[in-house]
Amino acid sequence: KIKAFAKINLALDVIGKREDGYHEVEIIMQSINLHDKLILFPAPVLSLETKNRRLPIDDRNLIIKAAKKIREFTGTQSGARIILNKNIPVGAGLGGGSADAAAALVGLNKLWSLNLSLSTLEKLAVSVGADVPFCLTGGTVLAKGIGEKLTILPSLPAEPIFLTKPPFTVSTAMVYKNLSLSSIDRHPDIKSILSIINTGEIYSINDYWGNVLEKATFKLFPEVKEVMQWLSEKGFPVRMTGSGPTLFMFRSSGNSNFKEIKFKLRELGWWTYEGALEGRGLEVTV
């Protein structure tokens, strides 16, 4: 059994576009305690099961892609029955698919007694997806390149957070397609955020954080911008994670408007989640 933790972006900056079409980024990634769960059993063939009917269970799923990469690398023909209990919303900018793929790599390495090192798993992870290497370790990490160059940062305390997501998904590819690098008027102050992380004073991050994909997502889905502005007016410093549409904020339990906020969002059909920062990407239990 493996818990695969979701992630948020404390800052997301796009530096430029490479010749191969990928974007150069600087991202501060942070695990949160919202998680999927994978259960793996020995089996004669490779299969994936989930009750979430929106998810493919073939090669389009990163779990199967990860399993085939590890098979191809090692030459093993072992099978596995993988059951996915899905809690992280799909297409939400929370890295659920990447977390599941990382869990599959670690779980199959153990199930099939392959004894691959973490560095080998990280190389396989890059070939599965840009966020998968981060999900292997999790915690608080600075990612550069296309997201594969990772620097592990000091762990942040388990501060309470609040997430909310509209009743639709967002295509990351579509957001990047609509991103105009020349129109970005404010970049997150990564250097200052790194200094704050070193001190652990997470609440002072609000002056420096940012996500340059917000403008592109807001153009496609103006209701996300409207809710973000409404939350800001209510006194909640709020940001979008990834390509959206999920919004997140740090919160103190003493905020009197919080119940009203949750009620209104649910009235609008938005999903909500109260959780905390997490220091790991995965949790493996026998």
Language-model region placement:
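Solvent-exposed alpha-helices and their adjacent loops that cap or buttress functional pockets
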Residues: 30-31, 126-127, 133-136, 153-157, ...
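Contiguous, small/hydrophobic- and glycine-enriched helical/loop subdomains that border
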Residues: 79, 101, 105-142
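Short, basic/glycine-rich phosphate-binding loops at helix/coil junctions
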Residues: 44-56, 104, 199-210
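Glycine/serine-rich anion-binding loops at beta->alpha junctions
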Residues: 83-112, 130, 237-251
